[in-house]
Amino acid sequence: MRKYEMMVIARPDLDEAGLQALSDKIAELITSNGGTVESQDAWKKQRLAYEIKHLREGFYSVFNFTGEPRTANELNRVLKITDEVVRFLIVRPAE
């Protein structure tokens, strides 16, 4: 199993319930594909460095998880088509 770090930027118009639902969806995707969530930072609203999809702010969160490469591939596929997600990045941290 490999370690991964994923940063997610969610739409700024989501409420607490929407952010919680998105967190649950991401955690379920990870666990259903053989991975485990090690930690998740709380969602924080921050100003974006530049406009993305006509938005100037977004909710940021970082997920640390372990899984197989197929786990990261499935997350990549699903998050690309998730409307609540503005941008995301999955990386393998330096050992």
Curated annotation (Swiss-Prot):
Record's keyword terms, sorted: Ribonucleoprotein, Ribosomal protein, RNA-binding, rRNA-binding
Cysteine disulfide links: none
Keyword Amino-acid biosynthesis: no
Domain of life: Bacteria
Listed GO CC annotations: cytoplasm; ribonucleoprotein complex; ribosome
GO molecular function, one term: structural constituent of ribosome
Pfam families: Ribosomal_S6
Biological process terms in GO annotation: translation
Function of the molecule: Binds together with bS18 to 16S ribosomal RNA.
PANTHER family reported for this sequence: MITOCHONDRIAL 28S RIBOSOMAL PROTEIN S6 (PTHR21011), SMALL RIBOSOMAL SUBUNIT PROTEIN BS6M (PTHR21011:SF1)
Record-stated family: Belongs to the bacterial ribosomal protein bS6 family.
Protein name: Small ribosomal subunit protein bS6
